[in-house]
Amino acid sequence: MSGGRQRTLPEAWRRAAGPALQAGRDADGNDDDDDELLAAAAAELDPDPNPNVDPNPGPGPEAAAGGFCAAAGALWIYPTNRPERPYQLRMARAALFANTLLCLPTGLGKTFVAAVVMYNFYRWFPSGKVLFLAPTKALVAQQMEACAQLMGIPGRDMAEMTGGTQALSRRELWASRRVFFLTPQIMVNDLSRGTCPAVEVKCLVVDEAHKALGNHAYCQVVKELSRYTTQFRVLALTATPGSDTKAVQQVVSNLLIAQIELCSEDSPEIQPYSHERQVEKIVVPLGEELGGIQRAYIHVLETFAGRLIKLGVLARRDVPSLTKYQIILARDQYRKNPSPQNVGMQPGIIEGDFALCISLYHGYELLQQMGVRSLFIYLCGIMDGSKGLTRTKNELGRNEDFMRLYQQLTDMFSDTCQTSANGNLHKSRTVSENKKEFIYSHPKLKKLEEIVIEHFKSRKMGCSDQTTSGGTCVDTRVMIFSSFRDSVQEIAEMLSRFSPVVRVMTFVGHSTGKSTKGFTQKEQLEVVKRFREGGYNTLVSTCVGEEGLDIGEVDLIICFDAQKSPIRLVQRMGRTGRQRQGRVVVILAEGREERTYNQSQSNRRSIQKAISGNKMLHFYQHSPRMIPEGINPELHRMFITAEKYKPNDSGRLPKGRPSSLHHKSALFSCVTDPKEMHCHENWSLSPEEFEIWDRLYRLKENDGVKEPILPHTRFETLENLDKTSKPEEEAAHKLSLSEWSIWQSRPFPTSMVDHSDRCYHFISVMELIEVMRQEQGDCSYELELQPHLRIEDIHVRRNKGHLSTTSSAFAQKTHSSKRDMARTKRPFVPDVNDNEREFFSIFKTTNTKTPRTAPGLDLEEPELPTDTNGSEPCSARRLTLVASTDQGSPKEEEIEKVTFDLNEFNDLCDDGESTVAHESAAVKDLRLLDKHCSSVGLNHTDLGYSSFTAEKSPASSDLFYLPESHVDSFVLVSSSAELAGLEGAFSCVKGLLAHSPPPVSKLEGIEELLRHEETLCPLPKVSCRSYSGQLPHGDFPSSLAVDQSLLPAESPELEVTIGLSAAVNTCVSKPASTPTAAGGAEERPPGGGSFHSLLGKEGFTANHTDNPPNKHFVQGDEEDSEMKRDVTIDGEKSIHLFEDEHTYKVNDEMPSVDVEPLLRLGSGGHTARPSAGPASQQPPSGDSPRGDTACGEGAARGEMAPGGAWGRGSAAEQALHNSELCDYSQELFSVNFDLGFSIEECEEEIFEGDTDAMNTPKLNSASRSRADVQLTANRKSLNDGCRVQTPPKWDCKGLKGRNISTPLPLQSGHVRDTAVPGGTAGGRTGRGSPGASPPSPATPTGRRVSSAEATRRIRKKVFSTVREETPEVCPTDKVNPNSQRNSFGSSASDALHTTGGRTENLEGTNLHTSRVFPAEGTSSESEEEIVFQRKNRRNNVLRSPDVGSDSDFGSPVCAVRKRRHPLTVSDVSSDDGVDFHKNPNRGTRGCSAAGSKAQLRGVKRQKVRSKVTCKNAARQFLDEEAELSQQDESCVSSDETEDTDKELSSSLAQFLNDDAEVTQVLNDSEMRGVYLKSVRSPALGSRYRMVHREFNSTEIFSQIPEQDEAYAEDSFCVAEGDEETCNKSESSEEEEVCVNFDLLNNESFGGGGGRYLTRRRKKLHGANMEQNCSAPVQKKPSRIIVLSDSSGEETNVSNEKGTAAHCSRAGRENAELLTSMPSVSSVPHKKSAGDVSAHQSAESKSGMLLGLKASVSEVLDFHPGPRSGSGKEALQAAAQHLQLESSVKNSAGNAPGATKASPALLDGDTALCVLVDSREISSGADVISSLKAVHGLKVQVCSLGSGDYVVSNRMAVERKFQSELLSSVNRTKVTQRLQRLQGMFERVCVIVEKDRTRPGETSRFSQRTQHYDATLAALLQAGIRVLFSSCQEETAVLLKELALLEQRKNAAICVPTEVEGHKQEMLNFYLSLPNISYLAALNMCHHFSSVRTMVNSSPSDIAAGARVSLQRAEETYRYLRYGFDTQMLPESLCAKGKSNTATRS
């Protein structure tokens, strides 16, 4: 109530008279009866908050009749605020007591009657709902406004609901409102969804009721409501009940009409209230010109229609007399009963001719009614192909007559075709030109123009006669109706020539076509509003203007065409004659159009006669009275003052608000107020709105509002940055930074505009603060920062030669901090667009002027040595320029401050969000510095990155670089070495900043863990003098922000990178022999410092030979190195820098050391990278030591000094450091990747463990953590050997939850003696990138490792990765004799690291003690010793104690035989990562060899030649792809899996195993097992030998019927593609099994042949094994992918107990292995898996991608699980616990968590529940309503995405009409849909339903087609159940039966089907996962408390939570851990994805 004004009269009564009335009632009852009645009515009308409670009970409570209020029902109120009309009063009274069809001509008050009825039902039923249905949104809004103004229903009780209202909002509205205005479709949806309380509906008003024909939404609403209740009133409103009596009867029946209230235009009742309508019919002859074109067109028609007439499919009649409708009927008849005489013809030809004739006849109708132009536009659409009628176009193009006619029309309208198409109403020509040029395409147009002009002339003359000359001219309005938009456009164009007298506007409906643009609802409303208010005086409209819309009074209506339906004519005529005399002119063309009009008039009269007589209509006889017997409401007239209507829906345009149409081009160009047009140029407010805002809302000085300011802040650790503070202003209001902190740690929902990146940064900072606040004891973040916030790091050495160190040192250190791992802790980065001032103010630089002023730089320029300037890019100097001087001038200090902050900024930006899109203001300042550099004449010649910025990385957008304008001046480079260094650094930097760090959540226990590791492995100090001279770039962190995606893989200039320098630091390097390479290297420890920082202060006691200054950096670093190295390890740095480069190009000569740094480092095409994904290429330099980049400086271009050699200590220490970090010190691994610096000078053995550390995690750790990497190097040997650094990011991340205490004891201390000359780059450079071939691991040369002890503690993971990644022998690999053997047990390390916390005591694993490493000088073959069983050496493969790597399978060339060597586990990491990662089609056999390697007693060290070409690198897993297609040993042959342990010989002679002589004893099944065994791959006993062609696994798997068990068991068609790929693409059809290769141990015949394990023997053997379950495992499990067969067989559940290694995939498991790990629980497995997932969203480093893969593989292949004899048995367990039925058979594997079905899932309502897809609302409404109303099922309508119905956790039902299957048109769509269903559900059922017969049609038997039968057969063959139904009700019965069946099998839906709040968001996330059905997502919502819980769950838990098979759970598990590289995204998504995903993780 505004201003105290009464809202309604009853409200006033209620307030004033209510209490007195009650008192009087209680006492004497003196009040007047009328007053009592009024008071009762007022009490009901009182807008009480709770309408259900009657505040004034009155004479009695609500009656029994559905909540009827007796007090209110005593009377019915008729408003008197409008003049009373008797016919309205009569109709309102009638409509209150029976269902009524109200027929009134337009403009005579139908809406008023409806408002009265609605208002009274609103009073009578306080808890009831009143509905008003209107067919369009515009009508809904209009009627709502009308009812509110007429009857005063409170706005808070009304709601408008259209398609724009969200379902959740509607649910709330249904619960809180009582009067609804909505479209019928929304009503149907809400009834089907159960949102609308159907039983509460008391009154239903239907507008435009004549539409209620057939299956219209009106009919569905009434039918659905009547299923629940009959107690509701129906009031139908229409001006024209139907086009004929049959249609009227249908309306009456559908709407349950009991009576009709009809007033025709001739009725005496309405005559006083309707003005005369003068209807004129004008018939226009066609004319000669149009007649000629018509004759030519008929000639064309005869040609094509004649074809059909000849074939007898079209009636023989006069061609011009045919109509489009007649041809359509003929086509339908032909389809139903094809003529026998046309059997030989292709039906497609006849169909095509029908379509052609229909198109031509439509054009003929256009020609006759609309004219030549409309015909031409239509034909243009056909001939230019826009209408898609290709055949029609071709046929017409071959017809000479047509082309002649078409050319004639083209010449006539050549200039107008375009005009019409673009919808422009106006041309820039003068009126006279337009008049001359306009072509009247039809004589009717001329007549129309005459009528309109005449009307305005006469009106103008009439105006001039009156006193108000000119004032009333605007009042006249003309409306023109035409059926087609082209005609509308033409008419408007014609009339627009008479502007301004005629102000014309078009009015059309919503756009449905491709070319024509319609009006939106807002545009329509705006047009109507302007027309009503006089903005336009002429409106040209299509039929959309005929109905409903209140367009005001129209004086002249012109119908440009006739309509056959009398309804439309009446509707058109109703637009006029409402308030004054109106005129209707119908312009008709001579001929057919005239006949059509006459016919419609005749129909109209007959309809009115039939209705008024009520003789022919059958009415509904059971209309409810709604009012209880004995109550007869009396009429009470009341004046109602309605409250001012305020539309509360955003869909409505508030009055006075300028429409968005102002922006629309040419829409309102004719009549637009200039003042309004320009209001949007500068604001979003119009001048009027601005004035209101300025007056009411603008804050002024006298308002007392103080200006808000931020409080002064400071860094505790950076006190010196802020020395001055400004005095506080009195008028300012100091904001509190902590007051709102509780809301600032998470993003709040947004609408339209998302949070900014800065906001997300801030939120992450607040999250960090919140985490720190809750910490107890030491602050982990403080510990992280402590090593980085040292003054030594901030203030650069004042040595002119060492300018570059400050920034890089700090940046790199900060970079490696834990914050990088946890993106949530990252502070915000200033936005790119922020100005410099803002950035510096944020970072508390007191003076921002200096960085921008050239003079400041000029002062210091003289102190910058030229060589420094030359060797450093200006961008590097930006930060450190001033800092290099010794004297600290104020300017210098200021710049230093900036420098520090920029370093910090760089740290902040280093990852995902500091991509190209996030260039900050700091960068701008840097650019300014650069400008100043150039302006003051600094020497820029050596700016080595010019080519990089300008040419190589188009995406860089000069982020952290000079703009392109600056690049040219830097083109010259003083030395190639420096150039390489710079570019390398830049590339690293870019990579470093391209990715986001992992979330904090996974780092909880890391510090304690790290400290523990440090104590375990104290880090010896190593002196290292690094060549930083070439890496000045390392000094400017700003350059670190380069996006990795910008690094061209081929760019040779990028070889040397910061990571490189970091790596270089790890080794003591000798002075570069070339001055250019030195570049001040010896004098620049700062460069070393930068490396130093990269390495996280590895504790290098500086070798300050040439470098005293280095001391400065080392000091203090070493003190903290023990504590901090964990966080700031080179690896981490490298990770950041080279995020995606986990695939390194393989160079034969690239020694592998610290893989990541180098590998990543060499992002440009580094030899260090075995492969760089698709873009990676072999290093251009071939064997040239491009790997020298690893060496850092001089080696960047192969310029390394020949005499340079690496010191042993540093590399060893590095490796040691890694081991310390992860406690891998006792594990033996060979480095099969480059460690990031060239080991060329390092004489130590390089451990590839780091590679594994860096890479394996990709594969084996669910998180990208490298922590899992186990370095196998013994600490002692490491001291002398090359120290491998595990990137902290990896190491630390994965540490959580992983028992890092399982180092592999490295027994040999001989590592140190291997020497790697700088010139040779070891072949193995690390796991290739996903998509690139992994290089073969090179084993360290000259090493002997002694005993099985080495592998005693190898984690089980070791083997997981080992087999996955065993490299193949590449015959092409050649290594220089002196090349370092860098592949050192990486596979083991990978595997170890993958263990994620489980340590296996492999004590009994008879590992070969003779671990021999080939001498260093041996040839590549001998060096790379691949250990495989000699092909003919031993016949009994199973007995072989040696691990063989059958590289033959991975390599096209036979591998060279080599000596056996102890297992230094081969390079798992590189292979895995590559294969599993991005190259789905790569073969993986080589790895499979590795998989079989660590077998039985002697696990041999596998070596591979170091030179691995990209082509062959990924083939290591090829063998692994030949998976055993076996579901169950017990079902097939018990020996099929267990004996695989010894089948390691690569000999082809073993293809058939002759030793098995006992086969006669076996039954058929076991005989088949013998055969299967004989064809297995010798390298992998459980793998079959297959053709070694690479192919996509999907090509094979997709052909395997899901339920063909025999095929799955016998199948040898197994994919050679990469395992992981298979798992991803077709994982639903595979299963992985752990195989114990030692099952047949000690069981052999005298002949040495392997004894086949029969079931009995296996059982006995298993029993023995169970007794020894506590014994350490000696066997290496191997994963086998088994084709999944999800048929319905269910076998007995194995009850064998024992801790089993869980092969997540179901399949065979080694009993010994399973039972031998009592100490290993599934908890660590879950934990490690979880760790990975948490980091996943935060980082997308390529190196990490591999580790992620590794962890996933580990989890899915090697975790403890219930012991089960076979996949089927395991599956059975899972199926039982998941309450699935037998058909799940092989879709699940044994999972530890499968046995724990969540109780939450079992608790649910007992009522049957069915999920229904929302699309079924329209096509299957009866099914839904029958399920609910008839069968009592709970039906939840939701967007299922696939499937129409879900009846249980495992069954989905697709409902198809018979016609869909009869026709082949939709074959592909049906197939795809069913395939998608099979991917989500165990069982799929198709219900084939007969097509619905329309009313009046006779059901016809449809002929079965061949396609129909073939489809049914295919469905059955695919295991899909097919049911048949005759109608929707029968379909509902079938669905109920299916649901009951599934309930009996414990698979029923038993979780709440609706979710709200955050669970809705969870549901949306789960639905985004592939192959997750809606029900599975629901189950997960209710089972897992959060998404995080689900993501961190094991596959078995996911299976139990989602109630899906274990296999699908594993698919989800894999998907969640899929290594995703954001750089693969399009640029538009890349920046957004990086920022949003990282911050929100």
From Swiss-Prot:
Catalyzed reactions: ATP + H2O = ADP + phosphate + H(+)
Positions with biased composition (Pro residues): 48-60
Feature: compositional bias, Low complexity: 1170-1181
Domain called Helicase ATP-binding: residue spans: 91-259
Xref: PROSITE patterns: HELICASE_ATP_BIND_1 (PS51192), HELICASE_CTER (PS51194)
Quaternary state and interactors: Component of the Fanconi anemia (FA) core complex. The FA core complex associates with Bloom syndrome (BLM) complex. This supercomplex between FA and BLM complexes has been called BRAFT.
Annotated protein name in UniProt: Fanconi anemia group M protein
Species: Gallus gallus (Chicken)
